[in-house]
């Protein structure tokens, strides 16, 4: 069995029918505001690790706490939330740990570029320290919008140094 796959949020993952392929991995990692419902054929349903950026998790959106039960009802095998950031935690992670029923990992990285790195980039860095081989799907380094909707401004990837991230990954 393949060990680990990281599912990116770019729309280039659609219409490829990768759902079964993805679900056959031992570790399936998704991040931030990923969606499963209506995308099962292309994205599968398995999620063993959910990577979130620190801000999404700790600001007023409280995304992890507010969405954990929904995510657990739509996916299989969720065992861990991984919060990745270049920001310093000021006690927020411990507060969140008391509110949820899965394991949380918090990892802070030194900023690799002048601008904020994407959560996907930080996830790749984190996972490569754990798995010697990492399969990536759904990454196009800012060429498309998120797969789950192209209609709202919040669906457009933020300002990141896509070229630098792509060069680092290549």
Task: Name every feature range the model reports, one short phrase each.
Residues 1-170:
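Metal-ion/cofactor- or nucleotide/acyl-coenzyme-handling active-site neighborhoods
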């Amino acid at each position: 069995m393949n060990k680990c796959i990281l599912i990116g949020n770019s729309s280039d993952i659609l219409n490829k029918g990768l759902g079964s392929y993805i679900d056959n991995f031992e570790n399936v990692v998704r991040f931030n505001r990923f969606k499963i419902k209506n995308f099962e054929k292309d994205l599968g349903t398995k999620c063993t690790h959910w990577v979130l950026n620190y801000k999404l998790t700790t600001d007023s959106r409280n995304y992890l706490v507010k969405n954990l039960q929904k995510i657990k009802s739509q996916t299989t095998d969720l065992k861990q939330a991984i919060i990745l950031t270049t920001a310093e935690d000021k006690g927020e992670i411990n507060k969140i740990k008391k509110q949820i029923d899965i394991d949380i990992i918090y990892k802070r990285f030194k900023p690799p570029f002048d601008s904020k790195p994407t959560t996907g980039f930080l996830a790749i860095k984190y996972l490569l320290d754990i798995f010697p081989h990492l399969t990536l799907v759904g990454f196009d380094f800012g060429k498309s919008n998120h797969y789950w909707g192209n209609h709202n401004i919040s669906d457009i990837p933020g300002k990141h140094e896509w070229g630098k991230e792509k060069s680092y990954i290549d």
